[in-house]
Amino acid sequence: MKNRGRTKPKKNQWADHYTQKARDENYPARSVYKLMEIQKRFQVIKKGASVLDLGCAPGSWLIHAAELTGPSGRAVGIDLKPVDAALPPNAIAHTGDIFEMESTLGEAVGQDYDAVISDMAPATTGRKDIDAARSFALCEAALRVACGLLADGGNFVCKIFQGAEFKQFENQVKSRFTSHKIFKPDSCRKSSKEIYIIGLGKK
């Protein structure tokens, strides 16, 4: 006779694996493994580089960027939410809204960065078209910041939700960088619409 009681929902083994791995390795979130894969493939952050992390909370990308650039470099982050995680000596996090601060962001965080990275994502609604449009708006803001604050030859990493605006944003990146790549890390959920656009060598 079958058990008609409630069955326990299956655990998300993917999330459990990366969440536990991040905890074991002292990172605030599993998203760090996406940056690790991007770095391994494209070497967007060099030793001694200066890196700006847009949407840096809870701090995993900022911490790893600081590790990659080393003590002779620096990693600067900005997010609406404060970063509570302990940061390396060469990393600092600012609290603020890049939309509100866009015209004065250079005064707050400096300029001539070697890399600008963005793992920003909008508050999701469950409507794929709306979520993709909101993601596109964040990406355009990130690209404007990157174009204003990157040194010539600098690199750009940006997460975007795939949708109707994806090709438009890809073309914007393509026009501003010597080369560009589209990449979905293995550590992303296979069902996720998120993907990364990497701009290499700001023109």
UniProtKB/Swiss-Prot annotation:
One of its GO terms (cellular component) is cytoplasm. InterPro entries: RNA_methyltr_RlmE, RNA_MeTrfase_FtsJ_dom, rRNA-MeTfrase_E, SAM-dependent_MTases_sf. Its EC number is 2.1.1.166. Keywords: Cytoplasm, Methyltransferase, rRNA processing, S-adenosyl-L-methionine, Transferase. It is an enzyme of class 2 (transferase). It catalyses: uridine(2552) in 23S rRNA + S-adenosyl-L-methionine = 2'-O-methyluridine(2552) in 23S rRNA + S-adenosyl-L-homocysteine + H(+). Pfam families: FtsJ (PF01728). It is found in: Cytoplasm. Specifically methylates the uridine in position 2552 of 23S rRNA at the 2'-O position of the ribose in the fully assembled 50S ribosomal subunit. This is Ribosomal RNA large subunit methyltransferase E. It comes from Desulforapulum autotrophicum (strain ATCC 43914 / DSM 3382 / VKM B-1955 / HRM2).
